[in-house]
């Protein structure tokens, strides 16, 4: 158990070092970008899906790791970008490094696990909702989604209706 905790913490540190590296390189990746945004500190978007749903390892994060990541971001001095401000300032140079937090799909585990933490800590985010599974087993209800929308820290975005795996969809179906 102790080894798991050490590995988990180490993975969080490595993830956030990568995040810091991305900040240092994001404006310099192309000549065109560096021409226009060389003084831009930039915005990095971090996306999450499931919380404490260990049976889905590719899209899950344990809450203790999520909280560690949020604390590291805060301790590094990065601000979380309010999505409404992000939209208004999209094409403007940024004078500070910021994080745009996004949550995909509207899984119930987000509502039960991460939402209380984000609400308590007033961390803004966008929840991209797939509309077809709303209210089904494992997904949030419309009332829960409306609660987040009313919170003034959670913004609702449209993900897709059915969340098809596009590689498997024919051109005609697309």
Name every feature range the model reports, one short phrase each.
Residues 85, 102-109:
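Substrate-binding cleft of extracellular glycoside hydrolase catalytic domains
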Residues 3-99:
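N-terminal pre-catalytic segment of deacetylase/amide-hydrolase enzymes
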Residues 64-71, 75, 112, 116, ...:
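Solvent-exposed, polar/charged alpha-helical surfaces in well-ordered, non-transmembrane soluble domains
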Residues 41, 46-56, 96-99, 108-113, ...:
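Metal-dependent polysaccharide deacetylase catalytic core of the NodB/CE4 family, i.e.
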């Amino acid at each position: 158990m102790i080894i798991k905790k050490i590995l988990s913490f180490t993975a969080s540190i490595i993830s956030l070092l990568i995040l810091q590296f991305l900040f240092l390189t994001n404006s310099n990746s192309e000549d065109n970008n560096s021409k226009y945004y060389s003084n831009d500190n930039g915005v990095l978007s971090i996306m999450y899906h499931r919380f404490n749903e260990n049976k889905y390892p590719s899209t899950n994060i344990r809450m203790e790791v999520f909280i560690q990541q949020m604390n590291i971001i805060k301790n590094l001095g990065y601000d979380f970008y309010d999505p409404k401000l992000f939209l208004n300032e999209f094409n403007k140079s940024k004078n500070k490094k910021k994080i745009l937090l996004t949550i995909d799909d509207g899984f119930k585990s987000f509502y039960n696990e991460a939402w209380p933490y984000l609400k308590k800590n007033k961390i803004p985010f966008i929840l991209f909702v797939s509309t077809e599974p709303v209210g089904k087993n494992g997904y949030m209800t419309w009332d829960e989604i409306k609660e987040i929308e009313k919170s003034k820290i959670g913004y609702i975005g449209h993900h897709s209706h059915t969340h098809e795996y596009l590689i498997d969809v024919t051109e005609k179906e697309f």
